[in-house]
Regions:
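Acidic-enriched and Gly/Ser
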Residues: 1-178
Length: 178
């Protein structure tokens, strides 16, 4: 859900309705600006009116990036758009050809944000060999993925393995079984 607040468009990332024992109810929110990517915490009173913003979602395919800008192609009409890196969550996990959802403002038709799938499958290109030692807990080691991202993986993961990575948190989920 996107809202207009303080002359900016925000995406509601988190919200919590609070009804204290004393006093009126309120809603705590975490809002992400769609223009500059900053996340703010805000509290709305129960009677506060909010203007929602109409948005459209379309599927786009990632083509390439040239530093700070990522280029995408609409999978329906093949139109291409360019989006700055600050509008992407975990862009280091996106590989060329990845299909993503681009959210655009219905009124201005400008892109607001890019949503990746919940998880992606990437190949480990370099990691140290795992040595079983005196580990009482789940030991991890850093691994560099095909996109250049570095994530911590369990000791049993080796170079060449494909792993599933959570795109929201940017961490290892499981080994991919082909």
């Amino acid at each position: 859900l996107c809202i207009r607040y303080n002359n900016d468009i925000y995406k509601i990332v988190e919200f919590l309705h609070v009804k204290p024992g004393k006093g009126p109810a309120f809603v705590r929110t975490k809002l992400k600006s769609m223009t500059n990517g900053k996340v703010i915490d805000n509290t709305f009173s129960a009677g506060h009116k909010i203007e929602d913003v109409r948005v459209e979602t379309r599927k786009y395919q990632s083509l390439y990036n040239d530093g700070e800008t990522y280029h995408f192609m609409n999978t329906d009409d093949y139109n291409q758009i360019s989006i700055e890196e600050k509008f992407l969550d975990n862009p280091q996990l996106m590989k060329e050809g990845e299909v993503v959802t681009v959210i655009t403002n219905s009124e201005t038709n400008l892109p607001l944000s890019v949503e990746m799938p919940p998880s992606v499958i990437l190949e480990v290109v370099s990691t140290e060999p795992g040595v079983k030692g005196n580990t009482a807990t789940n030991a991890t080691k850093p691994a560099t993925l095909e996109t250049g991202a570095v994530v911590n993986v369990p000791l049993f993961i080796n170079e060449g393995d494909k792993i599933k990575v959570d795109t929201v948190k940017g961490n290892y989920k499981e080994r991919h079984k082909e």
